[in-house]
């Protein structure tokens, strides 16, 4: 029975799922938006919201040790120091004062080959956080 077990399994074993989400999160940090299937987009949104929350905390804290610790946690997921620095130094600055909802998933239709539902995953613009 799978009571109270919530995880987007995506039809993959654990290491493959981890690698997939790592690659998708790297692409969204690098490019700002990506197109993927809706199931992958929903799993990615959860991971990216957690990463951006850590990045905001790392960017705003005065404690050097805590900032380094959070950067290392982010780098453990992204696997690239350049992307970690971009997330903390550039992207997180736009979301200071915002609590969650850093990533938007927009459904854009169905893929032609297999009719899989596709979605656009993008970082929410800094200007749209007002309101």
From Swiss-Prot:
Keywords attached to this entry:
Ribonucleoprotein, Ribosomal protein
**Which family does the similarity line name?**
Belongs to the bacterial ribosomal protein bL17 family.
| Gene Ontology MF, one | structural constituent of ribosome
Q: What is this protein called?
A: Large ribosomal subunit protein bL17
One Gene Ontology term, aspect cellular component: cytosolic large ribosomal subunit
Name the encoding gene, please.
rplQ
Q: Name one GO biological process term.
A: translation
Q: Which Pfam families match?
A: Ribosomal_L17
Show the InterPro entries listed in the entry: Ribosomal_bL17, Ribosomal_bL17_sf
Q: How does it assemble?
A: Part of the 50S ribosomal subunit. Contacts protein L32.
Native source species? Thermotoga petrophila (strain ATCC BAA-488 / DSM 13995 / JCM 10881 / RKU-1)
């Amino acid at each position: 029975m799978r009571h109270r077990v919530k995880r987007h399994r995506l039809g993959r074993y654990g290491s493959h799922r981890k690698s997939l989400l790592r690659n998708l999160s790297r692409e969204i940090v690098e490019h700002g938006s990506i197109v993927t299937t809706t199931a992958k987009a929903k799993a990615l949104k959860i991971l990216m919201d957690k990463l951006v929350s850590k990045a905001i905390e790392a960017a705003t804290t005065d404690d050097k040790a805590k900032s380094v610790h959070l950067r290392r946690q982010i780098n453990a997921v992204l696997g690239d120091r350049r992307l970690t620095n971009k997330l903390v130094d550039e992207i997180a600055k736009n979301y200071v004062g915002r609590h969650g909802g850093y990533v938007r998933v927009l459904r854009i239709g169905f893929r032609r080959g297999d009719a899989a539902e596709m979605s656009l995953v993008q970082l929410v613009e800094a200007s749209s956080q007002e309101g």
